[in-house]
Amino acid sequence: MVGTTATDVAPTMGVKIFSAGVAACLADVITFPLDTAKVRLQIQGECQTTSGIRYKGVLGTITTLAKTEGPLKLYSGLPAGLQRQISFASLRIGLYDTVQEFWGGEEATPSLRSKICAGLTTGGVAVFIGQPTEVVKVRLQAQSHLHGLKPRYTGTYNAYRIIATTESLSTLWKGTTPNLLRNIIINCTELVTYDLMKGALVRNDILADDVPCHLLSALIAGFCTTLLSSPVDVVKTRFINSPQGQYTSVPSCAMSMLTKEGPTAFFKGFAPSFLRLASWNVIMFVCFEKLKRELMKSRQTVDCAT
């Protein structure tokens, strides 16, 4: 995934991890309202509703949330979201090239097998580390203040404390199984598709290794990822947000959705998921590639000066 020109120096692992974390946080800040809309649409239809309001479409959900609960509600859970990107995206994206080289061994050109293995490895490790931030983020996004409903949590750190003390510390890792499956799918599809598309565009002289190439590759990766991960993503959101006892397991959550709402329930929130992931990918990958190069140029300048 590292693109270098003749004058570029390959970025170090530290530069890649730092660049991935910063780029992911920037992408999260810009696209977070879409993520909140996605969560609200995904939990809509459960027998236990949060507010009685029906959300319709991406813009309709965002508009309804802003009007009924205030514009700031669109960013509820953002601190946990940024914590998630620092602990999660920085590892799954920043370590991808290094792990790919490990799996590739003596390969002159990384094979599809080594790319997939790298995506599986970095995605799996990142989920276990970042899962508590995901649980808090989803719960803050899902809770409503309407109709006299008392919010479960007043803020990010309050949510961590209440979940750990009233439910158990292990609840912070609730939904790890569907989230692990989701992020293995996302990581493999997103990074491998981006890597393959970018390589094909550059190798066939269709586009240079620059912003237009990164943008197109990120858009294609975003669509493929959303299509494959949507069913698991909806189950993950429902299970994480559910109160104790509503579902006995991840499969029971999936079966409940299937029997009560039908197979289309697994694609609830597809539009905001795609808009969010595609725009997130574009912002993140373009910034990631640019930041890596600028940091290495700055490092070269400092090295030359000394």
UniProtKB/Swiss-Prot annotation:
Belongs to the mitochondrial carrier (TC 2.A.29) family. It is a multi-pass membrane protein. The modification Cysteine sulfenic acid (-SOH) is found at residue 253. Most probably functions as a monomer. Binds one purine nucleotide per monomer. However, has also been suggested to function as a homodimer or a homotetramer. Tightly associates with cardiolipin in the mitochondrion inner membrane; may stabilize and regulate its activity. Solcar repeats lie at residues 11-102, 110-200, 209-294. Residues 1-10, 97-115, 195-211, 289-306 are mitochondrial intermembrane. May undergo sulfenylation upon cold exposure. May increase the sensitivity of UCP1 thermogenic function to the activation by noradrenaline probably through structural effects. The chain crosses the membrane at residues 11-32, 74-96, 116-132, 178-194, 212-231, 266-288. Residues 33-73, 133-177, 232-265 are mitochondrial matrix. GO terms for biological process: adaptive thermogenesis; cellular response to fatty acid; cellular response to hormone stimulus; cellular response to reactive oxygen species; mitochondrial transmembrane transport; proton transmembrane transport; regulation of reactive oxygen species biosynthetic process; response to nutrient levels. This is Mitochondrial brown fat uncoupling protein 1. Has no constitutive proton transporter activity and has to be activated by long-chain fatty acids/LCFAs. Inhibited by purine nucleotides. Both purine nucleotides and LCFAs bind the cytosolic side of the transporter and directly compete to activate or inhibit it. Activated by noradrenaline and reactive oxygen species. Despite lacking canonical translational encoding for selenocysteine, a small pool of the protein has been observed to selectively incorporate selenocysteine at 'Cys-253'. Keywords: Ion channel, Ion transport, Membrane, Mitochondrion, Mitochondrion inner membrane, Oxidation, Repeat, Transmembrane, Transmembrane helix, Transport. GO terms for cellular component: mitochondrial inner membrane. It comes from the Eukaryota. Fatty acid 16:0 binds at residues 56, 268. It comes from Ochotona dauurica (Daurian pika). It is found in: Mitochondrion inner membrane. InterPro entries: Mit_carrier, Mito_Metabolite_Transporter, Mitochondrial_sb/sol_carrier, Mt_carrier_dom_sf. Pfam families: Mito_carr (PF00153). Mitochondrial protein responsible for thermogenic respiration, a specialized capacity of brown adipose tissue and beige fat that participates in non-shivering adaptive thermogenesis to temperature and diet variations and more generally to the regulation of energy balance. Functions as a long-chain fatty acid/LCFA and proton symporter, simultaneously transporting one LCFA and one proton through the inner mitochondrial membrane. However, LCFAs remaining associated with the transporter via their hydrophobic tails, it results in an apparent transport of protons activated by LCFAs. GO terms for molecular function: cardiolipin binding; long-chain fatty acid binding; oxidative phosphorylation uncoupler activity; purine ribonucleotide binding. It catalyses: H(+)(in) = H(+)(out). The gene is UCP1. The keyword Repeat applies.
